[in-house]
Amino acid sequence: MPETKPLRGPKPLAPGDRPARRVVRLVVNGQERQVAVRPSDVLLDTLRNELGLTGTTRGCDMGTCGCCTVHLDGVPTLSCLTLSLLAEGKDVRTIESVAPGPELHPVQRAFLSQGGSQCGFCTPGFIMTSVALLERNPKPDDAEIRFAISGNMCRCTGYNKIVEAVKVAAAELRGEIRPGPAPAGPWAPHGPHDKPRTKAARRPGSGGEGPR
């Protein structure tokens, strides 16, 4: 019988050695980019650290929060779990491409006007998920919206305002309502009973001023 030998993986790297990099071709926001990546590099790190596209945020690094959502060939994808090598030749779309001009995308406008964003950390992921939903389904109902965003986590809004924002954006994209002006800044009121704030609230004794 022929001698059989156990399968062996690659030899471990010596202390101080770094994994060899490989140049991959990525199509990011319509532009071809060549980047040298390690076998273990994930797309999130490549976008942020190598290409300077920091709009995609890092949340859990475990695929549970959805903050890092990008489009990969049109499909919402968690960039923290996607190896950069596997994205080679695919169409990668990040939050930076949603509104390349001076005007906001209807989804971005709706998130502002409806109060769908508070701390803003999770917002890029929600916007990317919502844009993908409305591109394939221009008139989703509440259940379809909630299902689509179920992979995105928000610790601030409670989701109702996010759902409302998606519905408003969908109506604008269908031409049923006119685009509304975006708030002038992060302190702009979102509703008839909200008052604009001029300074961030601070606890007494924290060294800052409270609201005036």
Residue ranges and their predicted role:
Residues M1-R212:
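Signature of N-terminal electron-transfer/Fe-S-associated modules in redox systems
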